[in-house]
Amino acid sequence: MKIAVLGAAGGIGQALALLLKLQLPAGSELSLYDIAPVTPGVAADVSHIPTAVKIQGFAGEDPTPALENADVVLISAGVARKPGMDRSDLFNINAGIVKNLIEKVAKTCPKACVGIITNPVNTTVAIAAEVLKKAGVYDKRKLFGVTTLDVLRSETFVAELKGLNVSRIAVPVIGGHSGVTILPLLSQVQYAEWEEDEIAPLTKRIQNAGTEVVEAKAGGGSATLSMAQAAARFALSLVQGLSGETVVECTYVEGDGKYARFFAQPVRLGKEGVEEILPVGTLSAFEQKALEDMLPTLRADIELGEKFVNN
């Protein structure tokens, strides 16, 4: 199985390359691409780690050599958030980057599963879908917004707050991947009993956790290391699914449009990518209201991406 990382010289990309070199199944191929000339050096650096994963690095304007025969493409290219910016401020730069890269994916490896990490994910996934559709190669089972970091943060914060073993915690997170569109379903967490006054502040902390890191890094970057771990977890689950194992992850995909054209919820991964989109289950009154309140924002984010490609 061949995995390509586009944006591999960045803060997320380098850490993601390291994690995948360590954790991909033996015999996998890892292909790193970035516009930055350092990229072959990143590959050389990571190649010295003794695992049975072959690695190559490519730099320059054209990602085509990195994409040839790729089964999975992970896109983390783009600019990162700085203090005072929200994910939508990134749109003007990152939208064009994602569009250009997806045009190359459509030409070179149209059957690959594509995981979009580049923010604003609510919008960049819609851009990717429209580009693939224009090229006549769109398969909604194979396009994903990587929202796994919201799940990781939810698991961590719940375990900390409740003094629980984090390895036993599973928190479904639905909606999108920014601000109010991030909705952790805390009412569905096993082993956790909630006080009335705990849910709203914890939900808000999960929604704003990215900003917490941006501010803590004081202009020196955004959440790169935890995002790389989230992307690695998602990619490894996807590889397992493509290999015929049954795995469930929350991810932002095009489903039945019940809430919005794209929506993050638990998805069973399989040999074609999305095997089955699972129901969100029973929501508490707080969650139901939060869901209804976020939908106009989420739909507007999606429409922005569609218009970017089609106008």
From Swiss-Prot:
NAD(+) binds at residues 7-13, 34, 94, 117-119, 227. Its EC number is 1.1.1.37. PROSITE patterns: MDH. It comes from the Bacteria. GO terms for cellular component: cytoplasm. Coiled coil: none annotated. It is an enzyme of class 1 (oxidoreductase). The active site is at residue 177. It catalyses: (S)-malate + NAD(+) = oxaloacetate + NADH + H(+). Substrate binds at residues 81, 87, 119, 153. GO terms for molecular function: L-malate dehydrogenase (NAD+) activity. GO terms for biological process: malate metabolic process; tricarboxylic acid cycle. InterPro entries: L-lactate/malate_DH, Lactate/malate_DH_C, Lactate/malate_DH_N, Lactate_DH/Glyco_Ohase_4_C, Malate_DH_AS, Malate_DH_type1, Malate_DH_type1_bac, NAD(P)-bd_dom_sf. Keywords: NAD, Oxidoreductase, Tricarboxylic acid cycle. Homodimer. Catalyzes the reversible oxidation of malate to oxaloacetate. Belongs to the LDH/MDH superfamily. MDH type 1 family. This is Malate dehydrogenase. The gene is mdh.
